[in-house]
Amino acid sequence: MKKRVAVLVTHEFEDAEYSEPVEAFRAARNSVTNIEQRAGNIVYGKQRKISVSIDRSIDDASIHDFDALLIPGGDSPSSLKIDDRFVYFVRHFANAQKPIFMCSHSPILLMQAGVILGRRITKMQHTFQDLEQAGAVLFDQEVMNDNNLYISSRSTLDLPYFIQETLKVLRR
């Protein structure tokens, strides 16, 4: 059964951390819905290599419409974490025991949502102290799968491992 993947994304996301997983998800015939503040917006990655058209506003997004959540890294998670609507969405997604896929800086959004305590995730150089203080259990490896719920990767260099693991989870 093909899965429905929500992507929380706004300006300054890490280009490859959006484009490569989304391309792989679509190639495996999963649907992808880009969510931001307003449907119809166009957001750009840090390297300006790609633009993303927003399919649905956060106000119209329900966790019940999706099977998994992707949060690309870059500066996007820092912008999203100051908006309670995105924090609420992530918190309820985690509480519903649905898989969350995160690259590099995206765990800070889960930290803001209060759903990182005791979770095993990969260690990102610039955020590891904050994540440790929030109670995350950090690992310095390419990808970490915490019970098929939290799948994380350190950086764009680890994307092949990340994509492989997320596709396994989507096939379940």
Regions found by a protein language model. Give the residues of each.
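Catalytic nucleophile serine of serine hydrolases
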Residues: S104
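Glycine/proline-rich loop-helix segments at beta-alpha junctions forming the active-site rim
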Residues: M124-H126
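Extended, subdomain-level signal for the structured scaffold at the beginning of enzyme domains
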Residues: M1-I100, L109-L117, F128-R172
